[in-house]
């Protein structure tokens, strides 16, 4: 059976590269369930992009929530902050996890992006309503649907559906949640 999805590696790569281009060198990661394919894929993409950018991967700057939701994201991010390892930006594996990061930063008197830049993933309908509006990776949902329908129609016409995965390139929507880090 064929599947169509956004390219996780490209999407996370866009977020990390954007932060690196702003001057961030210590970037944290908050992921969802690392056992899920999405969680594992996005984390592996994060590690690979850090290496590609020549940036350090510090295990103290990685936290995984048990679900891709705001509350578990907040708990994972709070634990990460409590470790005391300095960082200037965080890549959240989806927008709901990013919202959890916002909650914790606000509770601790830290500001986005003045103290910590934040990126999300998915460009959910409310991402532009975050305060400040969230920089996030946009999955080409419409194009995913069109390509999936094309593959389905081809399979119905041919009577076959060869196993394949089609990955479509996402884009980065830059909003107000990212900025250069403050000078040390």
Question: What annotation goes with each model-predicted range?
Answer:
Residues 25-27, 57-62, 112-117:
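Short acidic capping loops at alpha-helix termini that bridge into adjacent secondary structure
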Residues 1-21, 82, 86:
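Alpha-helical recognition/docking segments in bacterial nutrient-uptake
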Residues 18, 78, 83-184:
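Flexible loop/turn connectors
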Residues 3-14, 30-76, 91-99, 121-124, ...:
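Hinge/beta->alpha junction and helix N-cap segments in small-molecule ligand-binding domains
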Residues 13-16, 24-25, 49, 104, ...:
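Solvent-exposed, well-ordered amphipathic alpha-helical segments
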Residues 24-27, 86-88:
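Short acidic/polar active-site loop segments enriched in Thr and Asp
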């Amino acid at each position: 059976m064929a599947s169509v999805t956004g390219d996780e590696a490209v999407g996370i790569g866009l977020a990390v590269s954007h932060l690196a281009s702003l001057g961030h060198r210590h970037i944290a990661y908050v992921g969802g369930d690392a056992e899920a394919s999405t969680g594992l894929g996005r984390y592996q993409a994060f590690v690979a992009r850090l290496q590609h950018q020549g940036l350090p991967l510090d295990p103290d700057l990685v936290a995984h929530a048990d679900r891709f939701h705001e509350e578990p994201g907040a708990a994972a991010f709070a634990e990460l902050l409590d470790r005391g390892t300095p960082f200037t930006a965080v890549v959240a594996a989806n927008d709901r996890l990013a919202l959890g990061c916002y909650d914790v930063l606000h509770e601790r008197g830290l500001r986005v992006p003045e103290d910590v830049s934040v990126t999300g993933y998915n460009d959910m309908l409310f991402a532009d309503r975050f305060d400040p509006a969230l920089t996030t990776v946009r999955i080409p949902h419409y194009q995913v649907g069109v390509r999936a329908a094309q593959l389905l129609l081809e399979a119905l016409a041919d009577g076959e559906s060869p196993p394949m995965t089609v990955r479509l390139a996402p884009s980065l929507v830059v909003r107000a949640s990212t900025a250069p880090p403050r000078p040390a």
